[in-house]
Curated annotation (Swiss-Prot):
GO terms for molecular function: ATP binding; ligase activity, forming carbon-nitrogen bonds; tRNA binding. Keywords: ATP-binding, Cytoplasm, Ligase, Nucleotide-binding, RNA-binding, tRNA processing, tRNA-binding. The gene is tmcAL. It comes from Exiguobacterium sp. (strain ATCC BAA-1283 / AT1b). This is tRNA(Met) cytidine acetate ligase. The keyword Transport does not apply. The lineage of its organism: Bacteria, Bacillati, Bacillota, Bacilli, Bacillales.
């Protein structure tokens, strides 16, 4: 059985995702397409526009994806290298022969060459990194700038190139394949048949219209309003105002210099105002959003994984007939979780936080089972 994995957030699943999956299926000769998907919060530290169960169902109902596996929150709300390492680990546990991903370059050889160049070990890179950090750039920005100094032919400032680079560095036994992104740029809200997830969400929030998505995703938008950070601001604001500084510094991603800034942001009238008040060149919006996730979840540093190349369980969220065959193929060798148990305790806490503004009892974690979507 030829299995190709895609690492995704599907926030929401759109026409570009459909194209990527169908192209990957054709070009890699896959019998089964498997998506490893972020849970209730995204890698950049945002509440997913819809819960993981709805997003997984929409992906499988589209016909492009056969099986959706959860990337646990502790591994998914992380910087790019950790996110990539954990996701690749799951793909390799599932014995996927190929990992396919979208990239701005569309050039797999360039990505592989960049990943294998050991740029980070060169004195020139280290000097450029030191200089960028001294100039006040965040560690991620400084790393990208230093990489560009040493290796100018590969643009490591582009979001999908960054992830592709880290997938290549994390891959052990899996082959890599890339599909060049179509249509709008990641941050481009312009209307096209293929729009970015950011553009789709922004357009929906502006005028209430859903564009550039398959019917399965359009149906999801009719179930309830899209979730975003402002829905969580009353709870988050309360926690920012009341958590002692010493407690806040015990949370993931928060140090002694960031904690006071977060507390001060608690006086702001909205999430966007709070985010703008805290963000600096050193503390990017993404880093602050991840810190806000840690505050909302009360995610302690000692609850963070100690390694990211070994995810302790594999949890299916949705699958069709082909996806079920893929699960049967590995059930004797992989720690599959289909019913609630202690391994999901943290994820249950995540979902309780996620559903606060929704008050949707259907989301309670221990009530959920993997969803079978008939292929007929």
């Amino acid at each position: 059985m030829q299995k190709t994995a895609i690492i995704a957030e599907y926030n929401p699943f759109h026409n570009g995702h459909y194209y990527q999956a169908q192209t990957a299926r054709h070009e890699t000769g896959a019998d089964v397409m498997i998506a490893i998907m972020s849970a209730q919060f995204t890698q950049r530290g945002e509440p997913a526009s819809f819960d993981k169960w709805k997003r997984a169902k929409a992906a499988v109902e589209s016909g492009a994806i056969d099986l959706v596996i959860e990337l646990p929150t502790q591994y998914g709300v992380q910087r790019a290298d950790r996110f990539a390492s954990a996701s690749v680990s799951i793909a390799e546990q599932l014995r996927c022969q190929t990992l396919s991903f979208g990239s701005e370059s569309g050039d797999i050889d360039a990505i592989l060459h960049a990943a294998r160049s050991h740029v980070e070990e060169t004195p020139r890179y280290k000097e450029a990194l030191k200089k960028a950090l001294q100039e006040g750039h965040s560690s991620a920005q400084a790393s990208s700038r230093a990489f560009r100094t040493v290796y100018p032919s590969f643009d490591l400032t582009r979001p999908n190139n960054i992830l592709g680079y880290h997938y290549a560095k994390a891959a052990k036994s899996i082959q890599l394949h890339t599909v060049k992104r179509l249509g709008a740029d990641y941050h481009d809200p312009s209307l096209m048949d293929v729009m970015s997830a950011t553009g789709i969400r922004a357009h929906y929030l502006d005028i209430g219209e859903v564009r550039a998505v398959p019917a399965s995703t359009e149906a999801m938008f009719r179930t309830r309003p899209m979730t975003h950070w402002e829905h969580y601001w009353p709870v988050l604001q309360f926690k920012l105002r009341t958590l002692p500084l010493h407690t806040m510094m015990e949370l993931v991603g928060i140090d002694a210099s960031l904690a006071p800034r977060l507390k001060q942001a608690g006086v702001e009238p909205s999430f966007e105002r709070a985010l703008a008040a805290v963000s600096t060149r050193r503390y990017t919006r993404t880093a602050i959003q991840r810190a806000f996730v840690a505050v909302l979840l009360h995610w302690l540093k000692d609850e963070a994984p100690t390694r990211f190349d070994e995810v302790p369980y594999v949890r299916p969220l949705a699958f069709n007939d082909l996806g079920r065959l893929a699960l049967r193929d590995v059930k004797d060798d992989v720690p599959l979780v289909s019913k609630f148990d202690a391994r999901l305790d943290f994820e249950a806490r995540v979902t309780e936080a996620y559903r606060l503004p929704l008050q949707d009892d259907a989301l309670i974690e221990h009530r959920q089972r993997p969803q079978f979507i008939s292929s007929k």
